[in-house]
Amino acid sequence: MVLRGVRVVELAGLAPGPFCGMVLADFGAEVVRVNRLGSTGENFLARGKRSLALDLKRSQGVTVLRRMCARADVLLEPFRCGVMEKLQLGPETLLQDNPKLIYARLSGFGQSGIFSKVAGHDINYLALSGVLSKIGRSGENPYPPLNLLADFGGGGLMCTLGIVLALFERTRSGRGQVIDSSMVEGTAYLSSFLWKTQPMGLWKQPRGQNILDGGAPFYTTYKTADGEFMAVGAIEPQFYALLLKGLGLESEELPSQMSSADWPEMKKKFADVFAKKTKAEWCQIFDGTDACVTPVLTFEEALHHQHNRERASFITDGEQLPSPRPAPLLSRTPAVPSAKRDPSVGEHTVEVLREYGFSQEEILQLHSDRIVESDKLKANL
């Protein structure tokens, strides 16, 4: 795999950091998740990782992490600005120990600025990026599209990109560097198309009344006779013509496709037509055409959809739980996600410490002093 041999130390945090670490692990990196002692939180995104339980509030725990980072390629930390410095684990310290270290800092607001030390969640980062103002139905409040955009798109995935870029640059310079990955800025960067197309008038109407935000009758969803939904994205004229054909409508009897003043009435007409058939019936009509009409699938339906099955787009883990296959698909060095169950907290404490150069005596002492936790050591005491 493409990241085979890359050592990553991931400090436990909420979803964006674990997702970043999971992507790295899926593509071959050796990821150690450092959990807090006594942590009972689920490792929802721990596939392919190993878990070390370590107390970073005590000086011995800080020393352990410094020794690990001296041998690691990447440190991934998800804390607010200043937390790592307070622990004496800031980039100045760790890069002095290991000049080749990639020090990845994933936070909501970044490492500087007036919001850098305050709490926030996906919706807050989405709001500050400007993107939230664009999402929502006409006449309604803005609403977040789950917590995908800022947490995972602008956060975890953008941080993963930063790490891979820094690793590539290190092959030239031999030096590590600090990655300041802000979810606000990552989300804003994802919205570059929106910014660049503003002068074209693509977003001149209020939220929910533009061509790509649900305002157009040919770019929205419609309810079917059985209470399900179909998604329509027939923007181009040739695709729009196929949409009308499938709906049994004549273009001569309708206003011009791009007559935005007529869109509300056209949406009502399209909705009336879609409501006359079930989702399955509409799939029979539109599947295999270029009308850009697809069913809105549930997770369960997505698992079993023929297209997704042909591409093996979903996999099962060691506990037979389904999840998406890692993407993108590389031809020579594809991801090989672990089929094992996700690790329990501290499950690999002993083996990880050994790999990072700790002697048996040191490990026993750390356990005795409650700097680390390990069920394996407990069983032997």
From Swiss-Prot:
Key word Metal-binding present = no
Q: List the disulfide bonds.
A: none
Q: Which Gene3D superfamilies match?
A: Crotonobetainyl-coa:carnitine coa-transferase, domain 1, formyl-coa transferase, domain 3
- InterPro entries in alphabetical order: CoA-transferase_III, CoA-Trfase_fam_III, CoA-Trfase_III_dom3_sf, CoA-Trfase_III_dom_1_sf
Describe which pathway this protein belongs to, using the record's wording: Lipid metabolism; bile acid biosynthesis; Lipid metabolism; fatty acid metabolism
Please give the SUPFAM superfamilies that the UniProt record associates with this protein: CoA-transferase family III (CaiB/BaiF)
The short sequence motif called Microbody targeting signal sits at: 379-381
Its biological purpose: Catalyzes the interconversion of (R)- and (S)-stereoisomers of alpha-methyl-branched-chain fatty acyl-CoA esters. Acts only on coenzyme A thioesters, not on free fatty acids, and accepts as substrates a wide range of alpha-methylacyl-CoAs, including pristanoyl-CoA, trihydroxycoprostanoyl-CoA (an intermediate in bile acid synthesis), and arylpropionic acids like the anti-inflammatory drug ibuprofen (2-(4-isobutylphenyl)propionic acid) but neither 3-methyl-branched nor linear-chain acyl-CoAs.
Protein name in the entry? Alpha-methylacyl-CoA racemase
Q: What's the source species for this entry? A: Mus musculus
